[in-house]
């Protein structure tokens, strides 16, 4: 696995190699704008693998994306290879309908230490919940970014990531009540501890998430990619584009229903994804917002 191939995949050309916050931010932003957050393998009859060689082949060579356990694993590898002091952490995702965090550790994120200061880096949450910059590991501090205001809070050794969102405007009246729209202005995202993890810690949950009928990931096919101004999402056959702050403190959210032929074209043109197997788009009843 070649770090230069990874840099080429994310379009990163700087040779600064200063291992500072600016470079860390650039790596994160290049990755989230080049590598989609997606689970399409599941809906093409293929598996979601955790092996780094397989992930590298899928994401870097075949120009696909992946879910958090894959794209953040790749990010962790790249940062470590560059010389950053990085640690894998495990997260518990907030389930809005149940109003509680997941019982299983279903999210992988990365902690990076720079000159004695800790940051959270995550390229694998996608949609409008995706951070665009590393977050200072500081409790109770509002950290405004382009997508929203993020806030980390620590309580008895557990950290909580929340988001304060803008109002949203949906011009197409057909979709104003879409189940894909986030209704909460204050949104809990996930919790985590600072206990170091290895990829092996996620093996059983990786299998569960792609096989269980109760899993969000078997319920919906999705692909999400950040841009310079917002984020594209394809859920089932519904395409959305959210433009952050198109007006003062308001996001613009555009919807479009696609035909089967349009889906294949959109995956290639918007997300840069060419599938080897036929996708069966799915929009099941599990809660999932963009």
Swiss-Prot record:
It catalyses: an arylamine + acetyl-CoA = an N-acetylarylamine + CoA; an N-hydroxyarylamine + acetyl-CoA = an N-acetoxyarylamine + CoA. Substrate binds at residues 106-107. Its EC number is 2.3.1.5, 2.3.1.118. Keywords: Acyltransferase, Cytoplasm, Transferase. GO terms for biological process: digestive tract development; response to hypoxia; response to lipopolysaccharide; response to xenobiotic stimulus. The active site is at 68 (acyl-thioester intermediate), 107, 122. Its main location: cytoplasm. SUPFAM superfamilies: Cysteine proteinases (SSF54001). The keyword Cytoplasm applies. GO terms for cellular component: cytoplasm. Pfam families: Acetyltransf_2. It is found in: Cytoplasm. The keyword Nucleotide-binding does not apply. GO terms for molecular function: arylamine N-acetyltransferase activity; N-acetyltransferase activity; N-hydroxyarylamine O-acetyltransferase activity. It comes from the Eukaryota. CoA binds at residues 103-104, 208. Catalyzes the N- or O-acetylation of various arylamine and heterocyclic amine substrates. Participates in the detoxification of a plethora of hydrazine and arylamine drugs. Belongs to the arylamine N-acetyltransferase family. This is Arylamine N-acetyltransferase 2. It comes from Rattus norvegicus (Rat). The gene is Nat2.
């Amino acid at each position: 696995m070649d770090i230069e191939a990874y840099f080429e995949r994310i379009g990163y050309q700087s040779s600064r190699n200063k291992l500072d916050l600016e470079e860390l931010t650039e790596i994160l932003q290049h990755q989230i704008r080049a590598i989609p957050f997606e689970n399409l393998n599941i809906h093409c009859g293929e598996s979601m693998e955790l092996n780094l060689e397989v992930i590298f082949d899928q994401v870097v060579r075949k120009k696909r994306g992946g879910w958090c356990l894959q794209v953040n694993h790749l990010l962790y590898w790249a940062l470590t290879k560059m010389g950053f002091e990085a640690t894998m952490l495990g997260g518990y995702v907030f389930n809005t309908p149940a109003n509680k965090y997941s019982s299983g550790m279903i999210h992988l994120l990365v902690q990076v230490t720079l000159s004695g200061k800790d940051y959270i880096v995550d390229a694998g949450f996608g949609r409008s919940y995706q951070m665009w910059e590393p977050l200072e590991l500081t409790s109770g501090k509002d950290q405004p970014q382009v997508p929203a205001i993020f806030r980390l809070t620590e309580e008895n050794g557990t950290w909580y990531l929340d988001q304060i969102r803008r109002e949203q405007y949906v011009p197409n009246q057909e979709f104003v009540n879409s189940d894909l729209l986030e209704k909460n202005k204050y949104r809990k995202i996930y919790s985590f501890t600072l206990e170091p993890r290895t990829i092996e810690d996620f093996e059983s949950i990786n299998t569960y998430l792609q096989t269980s009928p109760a899993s969000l990931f078997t319920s919906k096919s999705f692909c999400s990619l950040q841009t310079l101004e917002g984020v594209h999402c394809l859920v089932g056959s519904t395409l959305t584009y959210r433009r952050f702050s198109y007006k003062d403190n308001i996001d613009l959210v555009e919807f479009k229903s696609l035909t089967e032929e349009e889906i294949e074209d959109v995956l290639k043109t918007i997300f840069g994804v060419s599938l080897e197997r036929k996708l069966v788009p799915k929009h099941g009843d599990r809660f999932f917002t963009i």
